[in-house]
Every structure is written in C-alpha cells, then in structure tokens.
C-alpha cells in the first residue's frame, strides 16, 4: 500500500516544480514510514515507456534513477510530473496485480441519471457503490449540468468518500472533455460557463465553444475525451493528426499543467490498439494520461436500463439505436482488481487520479450564500432598517399600545434574526408584499412564518401569533441549522406581475426560479418503456390505464396480464424490471411553481442557470431540497386560486351589491355562515370542500374561528395516523372528560381538549414534559419523518421517555404521547399554517353563503382550481337558488357576469365565452370589441364580418350552442357556419353579399340527449339536462335509487345507485380504501370502496366513467356514504360523453 501512497500522494497544486533528485528524496522520506519498504528505492519503468524511449536515449532497465534520465525533449514538464515508476524492494520486481489492495483510485468521470436519459443510476447509488469498492473519491460529471451533484454530497460525507463536482462538456469546435474545478472561484467560473451555454439556447440544450471554455478555464482541470468508441481504431487513427494538433496547441495553451488525456478501457476487442494509440498521442503531445471509467451506471445490471433511456431520448426502440448503444456493460463502477488489470501497462494513469483528486479542494459546503442587501436605505444597515419597519408595523397592529408580551417577543425574534443574519431575507419578502399591495394584488403569508410576530408586524402574515400562542422556533431556531422558509400566496392570475417585479429589480443575473425535477411516475414509465421495447401500443395503453399514476404498484404484473402482456415471458420480465427501475428517475427539469432565489452577487456563479420554458424567466438547476441541503434561502411566491376567486368575488359584490369587502372587514362571527359549514354545505370553498372534510364538519360542528383552525388541521394524515381524530371528537362531545397530568401539559393541550392536533403542540410537549429545548423539539419533529429508518428515532424516544419520567409522568402516558408524535411524521399540520388557511376558509364560506352568484362566477373565472369541475360548481349554485344562463354570443362577456333580477334574491349568472373549449381568448376579445362598438349581431354573416372570425371560429361557437340568439338551432348553426367565408374582409368588393345560409329541410334538429352530449363536449357541462336523466327509466327498472332518495333511507339498508363518476381519491393513509364521488340528475353520492372490492372490480373501477353500484348505506349524523360491494359498468350508455373528472391521491 505504501508504494502506491508514496507514488500518488504528491501535491500537484503547487506551481513550483522540483528536480527529479528532490522528488526522489521526498519519496525516500515517505518510504521511511511505510512498512515493507527500504530507503534505497529503485524504479522500474513500464514496458511501453522503455520501448518508447529506447531510440531516444539509452538507459538502464532496472536501477536507473531519475537523475540519470533526461529525455531529449525541450519541454520536460510532463516527464517530470508523471508517475511512470513503481516502487519495490531491491531485488524483488513489483507486479501491479500483486499489490491491488494497496491501490488507490478515484473515479473522475461519472454520468448519473441527472444527465437526463443518458445515465442509469442515481447519484447516491454511485456514491454508495464507490465506497463499497474501496474508491477514495468519486466525481459526478453530468453532461453540461450540475443538477444532480447535491444528491450525492451528503451520502459521500456520511461514507467518508471524497466528493468531486465536475461536468462533461461537448464544445462545438473541440473534442468533448471533462472539467473539475479546483476551488470555489473555479467552481463559480464553471457554473457561469455552463450558464452561458444554456442561456443562448432553448430550454434543455447547451452550446459551448472552446473559446467559452478558455475564458473560464482559470483554476479548472480538464481531461480530453480523445476517442470515440463508436469508431474503429483505424478511423481513430485517421483523426490522430487533428487530436495532436488540438492537444499540442489550444488545449496546452489554455490548461498547461492542468490538462490531461482521458484513458478509458471497457474490455473491447481493440483495447490493446486503443492503449497504444493513447500512449502515442500522450507522448507526442506531452499531455499525461488519466484513468477514467466513463461511468454511466453503478452496476452492470443497469446496462439494459441505459439502453432503454437512450432509446427514450431518441424516440426510438432499443433495437433501432444499435449504433448508439454501449458496446458492453463495462461502463459501471468496477472493482480495484478489474482496474488494476485494465491499466496494468499504464499504472501511472491510475495513480494520477489521486493527484487530480488532491488538486480538487472545492466542496459544496464552501458555497456561502449572500442575500441582496440593497433594500436598506442609504446610511442604514439591513438590520437597522428591519428593526425600524418592525416597530412601525407593531404600532400599526396595536394602535393603543404594543403589549409588553409582544415587545418581549419582538426583541427575542429580532435578536435571533440578527444573530443568524437573516435580516436581508425578511426585507426581501416584505418588499414583495409591499409591491403586491401597491398593485392591489391579494396576498397572504402562511406556513411556519405565521409563527413570527416580526412577519405579522411587517404585514407578511395576517394571523397574530400571540393570540394563538404559536411557537417561533417552529420557524427559526439556532439548533435547526437551516434557513427559514416564508411562503406567500398571491392571486394565481396576477402572480406573474410579482415575479417580473423581481426580475426587473435584481436582473436575471441575480434572480432565478427554483427547479422542479420532473420524475417518471408509474404511468409515464410504463408508456416510455413500452415504446422502447416496441410492445404493441394497444397493450401499453391498456396497462397504463389500469396501473396507478404515481408510485410503484405491486399489482403491476397482474395488470400486465389483464392487458395481454404475460409477465412471465422474457419480454414481460424485462418490461417489469425496466418500468420498476425507471419510476423515480429524473425526466427533465421544470420550474417550481413559485420558489425564487435572489443573490447579492451573480446567481450563475452559485448554480447553473438556464432559460425556463416561459419567456422572460430563468431557472436554476437545483430544486428546493437541494437548496435546503446547502443552506440557500429562497422565497416561495406561490399562486393560490382561492385568492383570485376571493378578489374577483369582492369586485362583483362591489359592482352589483354596492358593498366593499376585504379580508379584514368580513363580519367575523356570522351565524348563517357557520350554520352552512356545520351542514357540510361547502362545495367550492377553500380547504374544507373535500370528501373527508365534508364528512368531518357535521361531527366537529365548527362555531368559531379556532374551530376552523382545528378542522383544517385534523383531516390530515398525521392526526389520522397518530389516532387523534376519534379521541378529539369524543372529547368534543364531553369536554369535561379531558385529563391533564399537570398544569404545564394542560396549557399545551387544553385548547385541543387534551389531544395534540398540531406540530407545535408536539414540540411543546417535548419541551414542557421531557425537558427538550425548543430547538431540540424541532429536531424531534423532523426526525419523525424518518421513524422507519432504524436508529433515527430511538435516541429521541429514549430522551423523551426519560425526561417525562424525571418530571413524574407515568410510562403509559409517555408512550402514548410518543405514539401520537410519531404519527405526525411530515404529515402533521402546523398550527400557524392552519391558522392562515382558516382565514380564507371563513372568507370563502361567508361569500358563498351571502353572495352565491358572485361566488360561483368568481370560481368559474379562476379555474382551474379546487376539487370540483365547473359542472359541479354550477349545479351547486343552482341548488342555492342561482339561475344560470348559457353562453350567448350577444350577451356573454369573456368572463362570467351577473345580471340583476328583481324577482329573485340573487342575480342571474351568464356564462362567459371562456367556457367554450377551443375558442382562443383573442377571438373572444374581438367579439366583445365588435359588439360593444356597433351593438348585437344580427346573424352569422354580421358576426363573421364585424368580428373578422374564421370559419373554424364560427364552427366552434356553433358547436357550443353559443349562436342560439342568431341561428335557428344548434345543427342549423353548424350548417350555416360552413357557408361563411373563411375571412371576414378578404373579398371587399363582395362584402355586402351574404352567403347562402339556407338550411336543408332534411336537416333534423338534435334530440335532447344529443344536445346534452354536445354541451359536455364543448363546455364540459349542460344546463339543459343531466345525462343520467335519459337513462332513468332503465335505472328504475333495475331498482336504482336517486341521490336525493338516500337521506330519507335508514342506516344499514342495501341500496343500488347509478351515475357518472366525477372523482376518485385514494389517500396514502386510507389503507387501500378508495373514495369515489358519483353524480346523477338529483345530486352527488359518496361511495367507499375497500381494497378487496377495488381489486375485484379493478377494470371497471379504474376505467369506466359510469357505474351501477350495490352496497350498504351509512347514514349517521347527516353524513351519508354507500359502502360498495359490487360495481357494474354503465359506460355503454355514456358512450361518447366527455365527463369532466378529477382523480386525486
């Protein structure tokens, strides 16, 4: 081992060069500390070196020292720096393969799956395998990307493996090469270079020249990939002059002693010839050889997946990419024994990997993030400005005097913010909110930031944390060691204004969107692998429809069999393996919905940036988890559809009811609103419109704001898994039965009747009951997410139980508390988050209760959002007394509008042109402009001429029955649209001549059923009738009940119902239970399918949109379900009907 360490441990980073004699002295000094060696060392030159230099100078084969050897080359830099010698005791020849255990190696060229369809292993898999094989280090060098480097950093630290950041580039005018930055400055230059190449191209591409590389080369090591294994050696020889010219000239000029020639061998038939060619090229150009594996996957078994992803990237089958497939499976991380054998003639190339690794001192933890500081006025520091704004805001929040408790809390928070240097971050978020409100954009902070009184004083959040006793350490603590996360919701239709404000303020060089790594899910993996294996599209389509959309499905083999693909055949097994492995692989980068990173310096020197799909945006290559891992702050500028709907509803209420409302002026304790909530009449409102929430409302019976906070939080996986729901409901029925071991615990749990509902309560319990510090309590909360990993939670469990015991609490109570805390995991809802959301819950419920027309119009204008499709929202509005009118060319605006009706308590609702599928908004705008200018349209010709519509635009409107006011009937309108000229003013001389719009007598008007089917196809809903109404006679013969009949039936009776499937929901915490919403002409029905029923009727349940169901009715406390026992397919009756459906996990 020592001989290799002596040979490879030299530092190559110094610019000072030593003589061969000095070098030999250094090696002798090192050997004195290595057992098995002696001070007098002889050096044996490798076979190919002796042969290469035999003609140039005579020298002794053995025993020749460096002093005796002086190659007749003008530039001897490489001859001095290279390591061709091998050390051995005198008289005993050293054989490379005999000393494998002493060999040191770093793999410097690895593509992970973040090369996007050109790598077949996750970064952490590569790191784990390299450590298992005894490598000293590993470099992740994805192609023109650093998107995956953070994923392997923490695993490498845990395993003690040197982790090197690099990249592989393919310049347009030079051979491809691998780059490794040596320090932080070099890393910044590499990122800027890659950003330059990506910003000049469309999303996902990179274009670099060697000049670009040369401009950023300072401090960067480079290895040239001089061979192309798709060519024969003879073809490579034809390019040897070009390679020599590049290596001797531009490459040496730019990289000097930082340049290498990469040597990779993969047990090809021409490895010997390739080695000779590389040796000759290295000696001729004075560029040293460097061993690398050109790794594409961590294990040889992944070769099949690599072939698959390459085929996917090219849109071909595996059989069609023969020329682009790897020759064999040797592009994996190989054992040291294999490396020793492959490089037996050039061991210096292996030793030089240690040399490169020693020169690469940069690590990701050297990235020091600096937030923009220019928001502070001149003459003030950011912390001084933050303090001034905070105290000004406090006086505004408490105009009668800031309470002493608040003053104390503010001082604590500001001190912590100053100590952790987060003041500029808070100022940036404050500036965003200030800008939004100056533009009358509705916004509200939420999440853990609602724990902060500073955020409340700055106007970022709307919940007073002193009223709800929120925990600031849930937001920021010294022990957490990570950045705070402030989430701000903006109207989703105006959020882009806020984003562009940031780009204008900081520039695209200092601001960028956070990335989202779009990964393969089950359905997409099935389709892509199926194409790559050339499996019949019909079979793959059937498998994809039957399989789940998200994660791995243990029933996939059975689903394949159902679709006609035998999973026991070689093809079937291959398909299953590739599909299962591909799930979770990154497919491409997209932009986060709102995560934004701003920096004091250049963002592209912190991380690679590229163009987003949307013009005017930049996106960095790291996602939110990557940023958290390396401590980079981001601002979440999130889009919330309900804020858009509330803003729109406020406008309509002001215009039609002459009442100006805001979130702060809505009456806080409106009895009719709470009556509606208790009746679970909450379709379309915020957060409490889901099946589970609507089932909980009649049992919880919210009657105040804090009840809504609990309602929002309790229907979450955490409380459900921690078995907190039923105990809380029982305590709600009998509050006096709640028990508290001591007053400290009573203070924590009294507001939730002795049951921990919120994450903050779990943390406070650890503090008051077990003696945790607030920071330790937050670490406990985070450890809950990893409780399935052995050992992670045990240390907290012991500390928790012992702490409770020391405080006099019995073991049963302590174990119960721990069980409840563990149930949260990452699913427990923070009280701060629930409190912020509860404000919007109440506001949306108030608007629905008192202004149902305006509320429905606002929801329709804010789509897509929420659980329900427009058809269900409109039906719900009709049940609340709202008259809804169809789209009409002479009355509809682009958005829905309200029409006063003196004979009704609520205005009428006219649907807008935006409801017509396939009608561009620009066309709708032309129609409105023409109508406003010269009045209603008289006929089709008038519409075509004045609005300058194309024939296809007229046909789209006719199909949607939007021309009813100017045409005989729908079918006639379609016929007449065909007679219109395709351009309203293309023939000015004949403009006054109307086309022949007569309708043939044999053109029969559509039947009511056809009308409804066309309504669904063109607008997603029908105001004429419900499709099920046309099947009612047949359903009555089958003894099917209507939805309106179910509340009248007693609990436990057998029922048969039928309808259209609107929604399927299968939560991960429901133990395989699927919840389904089905609708008939009288209303909706809630169905429950247990796992065995879902499995038995899987084909129908998954693929059909119309069912007949037999089951048992549950009718308890106003909550009605049908527990399904049997499902029949009604899709034949619904053939051709395009029912809007929303499926959720």
Swiss-Prot record:
SMART domains for the chain: POLIIIAc
Function: DNA polymerase involved in damage-induced mutagenesis and translesion synthesis (TLS). It is not the major replicative DNA polymerase.
Species in which this protein is naturally found: Rhodopirellula baltica (strain DSM 10527 / NCIMB 13988 / SH1)
Family to which the UniProt record says this protein belongs: Belongs to the DNA polymerase type-C family. DnaE2 subfamily.
UniProt keyword tRNA processing present: no
Gene: dnaE2
InterPro entries cross-referenced by the UniProt entry: DNA_pol3_alpha_NTPase_dom (IPR011708), DNA_pol3_finger (IPR040982), DnaE2 (IPR023073), DnaE2/DnaE/PolC (IPR004805), DNAPol_HHH (IPR029460), NA-bd_OB_tRNA (IPR004365), PHP_dom (IPR004013), Pol/His_phosphatase_N (IPR003141)
Reactions the enzyme catalyzes: DNA(n) + a 2'-deoxyribonucleoside 5'-triphosphate = DNA(n+1) + diphosphate
Any one GO biological process: DNA repair
Record keywords, A-Z: Cytoplasm, DNA damage, DNA repair, DNA replication, DNA-directed DNA polymerase, Nucleotidyltransferase, Transferase
Cellular component annotations (GO), alphabetically ordered: cytoplasm
Coiled-coil annotated spans: none
Enzyme class: transferase
Entry protein name: Error-prone DNA polymerase
Localization of this protein: Cytoplasm
């Amino acid at each position: 081992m020592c001989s290799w360490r002596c040979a490879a441990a030299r530092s190559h980073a110094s610019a000072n060069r030593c003589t061969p004699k000095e070098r030999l002295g250094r090696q002798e000094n090192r050997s004195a500390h290595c057992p098995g060696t002696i001070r007098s060392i002889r050096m044996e030159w490798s076979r190919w070196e002796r042969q290469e230099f035999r003609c140039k100078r005579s020298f002794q084969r053995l025993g020749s020292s460096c002093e005796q050897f002086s190659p007749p080359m003008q530039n001897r830099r490489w001859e001095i720096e290279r390591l061709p010698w091998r050390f051995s005791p005198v008289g005993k020849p050293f054989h490379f393969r005999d000393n494998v255990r002493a060999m040191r190696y770093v793999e410097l060229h690895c593509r992970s799956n973040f090369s996007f369809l050109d790598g077949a292993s996750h970064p952490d898999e590569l790191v784990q395998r390299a450590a298992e094989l005894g490598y000293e280090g590993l470099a992740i060098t994805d192609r023109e990307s650093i998107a995956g480097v953070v994923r392997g950093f923490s695993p490498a630290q845990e395993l003690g493996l040197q982790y090197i950041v690099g990249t592989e580039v393919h310049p347009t005018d030079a051979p491809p090469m691998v780059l490794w930055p040596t320090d932080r400055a070099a890393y910044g230059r590499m990122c800027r270079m890659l950003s330059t190449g990506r910003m000049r191209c469309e999303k996902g591409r990179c274009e670099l020249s060697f000049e670009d590389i040369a401009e950023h080369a300072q401090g960067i090591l480079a290895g040239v990939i001089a061979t192309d294994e798709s060519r024969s050696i003879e073809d490579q020889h034809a390019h040897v002059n070009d390679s020599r010219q590049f290596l001797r000239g531009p490459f040496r000029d730019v990289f000097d002693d930082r340049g290498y020639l990469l040597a990779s061998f993969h047990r090809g038939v021409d490895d010997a010839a390739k080695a000779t060619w590389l040796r000759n090229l290295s000696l001729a150009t004075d560029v040293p050889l460097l061993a690398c594996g050109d790794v594409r996957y961590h294990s040889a078994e992944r070769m099949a997946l690599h072939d698959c992803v390459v085929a996917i990237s090219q849109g071909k089958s595996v059989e069609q990419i023969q020329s682009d497939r790897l020759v064999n499976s040797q592009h994996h991380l190989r054992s040291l024994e294999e490396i020793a054998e492959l490089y037996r003639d050039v061991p210096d190339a292996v030793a030089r990997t240690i040399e490169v690794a020693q020169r690469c001192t940069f690590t990701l933890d050297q990235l020091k993030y600096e937030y923009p500081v220019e928001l502070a006025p001149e003459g003030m520091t950011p912390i001084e400005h933050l303090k001034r704004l905070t105290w000004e805001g406090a006086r505004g929040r408490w105009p009668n005097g800031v309470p002493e408790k608040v003053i104390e809390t503010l001082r604590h928070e500001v001190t912590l913010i100053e100590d952790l240097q987060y003041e500029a971050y808070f100022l940036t978020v404050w500036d965003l909110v200030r800008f939004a409100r100056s533009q009358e954009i509705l916004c509200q902070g939420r999440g853990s930031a609602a724990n902060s009184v500073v955020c409340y004083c700055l106007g970022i959040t709307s919940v007073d944390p002193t009223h709800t006793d929120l925990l600031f350490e849930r937001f920021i603590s010294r022990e957490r060691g990570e950045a705070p996360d402030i989430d701000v919701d903006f109207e989703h239709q105006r959020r882009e204004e806020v984003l562009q404000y940031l780009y204008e303020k900081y520039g695209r060089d200092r601001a960028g969107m956070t990335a989202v790594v779009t990964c393969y899910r089950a359905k997409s993996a099935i389709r892509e692998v199926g194409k790559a294996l050339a499996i019949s599209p019909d079979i793959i389509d059937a498998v994809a429809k039957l399989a789940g959309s998200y994660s791995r499905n243990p029933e996939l083999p059975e689903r394949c069999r159902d679709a006609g693909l035998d999973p026991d055949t070689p093809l079937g097994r291959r398909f299953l393996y590739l599909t299962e492995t591909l799930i979770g692989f990154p497919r491409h980068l997209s932009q986060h919905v709102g995560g934004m990173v701003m920096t004091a310096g250049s963002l592209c020197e912190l991380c690679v940036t590229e163009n987003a799909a949307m013009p005017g945006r930049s996106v960095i290559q790291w996602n939110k988890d990557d940023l958290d891992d390396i401590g980079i702050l981001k601002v979440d500028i999130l889009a919330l559809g309900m804020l858009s709907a509330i803003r729109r509803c406020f406008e309509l209420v002001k215009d039609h009811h002459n009442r100006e409302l805001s979130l702060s002026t809505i009456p806080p304790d409106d009895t009719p609103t709470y009556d509606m909530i208790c009746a679970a009449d909450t379709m379309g409102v915020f957060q409490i419109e889901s099946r589970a929430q609507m089932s909980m409302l009649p049992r919880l019976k919210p009657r105040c704001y804090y009840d809504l906070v609990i309602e929002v939080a309790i229907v979450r996986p955490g409380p459900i898994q921690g078995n907190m729901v039923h105990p809380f409901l029982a305590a709600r029925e009998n509050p006096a039965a709640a028990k508290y071991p001591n007053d400290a615990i009573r203070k924590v749990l009294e507001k939730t009747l002795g049951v921990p509902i919120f994450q903050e309560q779990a943390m406070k319990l650890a503090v008051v009951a077990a003696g945790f510090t607030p920071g330790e309590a937050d670490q406990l909360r985070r450890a809950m997410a990893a409780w399935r990993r052995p050992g992670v939670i045990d240390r907290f469990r012991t500390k928790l139980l012992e702490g409770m015991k020391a405080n006099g609490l019995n073991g049963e109570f302590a174990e119960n508390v721990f069980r409840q805390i563990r149930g949260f995991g990452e699913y427990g809802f923070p009280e701060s988050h629930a409190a912020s959301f509860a404000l919007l819950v109440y506001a949306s419920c108030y608007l629905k209760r008192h202004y149902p027309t305006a509320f429905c119009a606002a929801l329709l204008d804010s789509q897509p959002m929420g659980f329900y499709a427009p058809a269900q929202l409109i039906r719900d509005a009709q049940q609340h007394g709202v008259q809804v009118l169809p789209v009409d060319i002479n009355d509809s605006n682009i958005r829905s509008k309200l029409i006063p009706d003196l004979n009704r308590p609520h205005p009428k609702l006219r649907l807008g042109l935006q409801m017509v599928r396939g009608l561009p908004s620009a066309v709708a705008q032309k129609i409105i402009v023409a109508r406003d200018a010269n009045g209603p349209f008289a006929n089709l010709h008038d519409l075509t001429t004045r609005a300058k519509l194309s024939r296809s635009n007229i046909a789209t409107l006719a199909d949607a029955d939007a021309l009813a006011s100017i045409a005989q009937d729908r079918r006639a309108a379609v016929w007449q649209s065909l007679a219109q000229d395709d351009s309203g003013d293309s023939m000015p001389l004949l403009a006054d001549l109307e086309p022949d719009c007569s309708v043939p007598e044999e053109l029969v008007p559509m039947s009511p059923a056809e009308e409804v089917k066309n309504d669904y196809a063109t607008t997603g809903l029908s105001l004429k009738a419900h499709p099920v109404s046309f099947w009612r006679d047949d359903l009555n013969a089958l003894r099917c009940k209507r939805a309106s009949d179910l509340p009248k039936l007693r609990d436990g009776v057998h029922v048969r119902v039928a309808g259209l499937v609107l929604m399927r929901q299968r939560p991960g915490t429901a133990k395989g239970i699927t919840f389904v919403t089905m609708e008939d002409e009288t209303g909706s029905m809630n169905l429950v399918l247990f796992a065995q029923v879902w499995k038995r009727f899987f084909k129908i349940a998954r693929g059909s949109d119309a069912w007949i169901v037999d089951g048992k009715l549950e009718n308890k406390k106003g909550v009605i379900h049908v527990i399904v026992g049997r499902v029949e397919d009604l899709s034949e009756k619904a053939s051709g009907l395009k029912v809007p459906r929303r499926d959720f996990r």
